[in-house]
Amino acid sequence: MAHNMNEVRMLDFSVIGDPRGYIVVAECMKEIPFCIQRIFYIFGSKRDIVRGNHANKKTQFVLINVAGKSKVRVKDGEGNEAIYCLNRPHTGIYLPTMVWKEMYDFSEDSVLLCLASEHYDPNEYIRDYDQFVKMVCTEESLS
């Protein structure tokens, strides 16, 4: 079972421009596949720092590097993983529930915008990879 890895996907947002500059548009339940409950952004991270390192039971995310670049490693707990490079302000990545995420290789000017489907709840975060793998295996054995 691919535990939501098949739902991970890159998103392209509309860019509207004129001589004054550009606007990127992303609306809930259109380009963003959920209603946004929380917005935060990551900046000032060094290239060798890894952020994230967790999976979520309930929260979906869209990540957009609105400035600079970073990479996102996504794992399913069954040995499958993919790496995505976020380096354009009009593209993002959709991360469903129950995928392990690691953000890293931040450029000095990186600003990573994070859109979340749920308000913050520390109890729905899985911060130990071994525990995540066990949960994935348990879920598979129940299906």
Which residues are covered by each model-predicted region?
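Well-ordered alpha/beta subsegment
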Residues: R88-G92, M98-D105
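Non-catalytic, conserved peripheral segments adjacent to functional cores
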Residues: M1-T91, E108-D109, L115, D121-Q131, ...
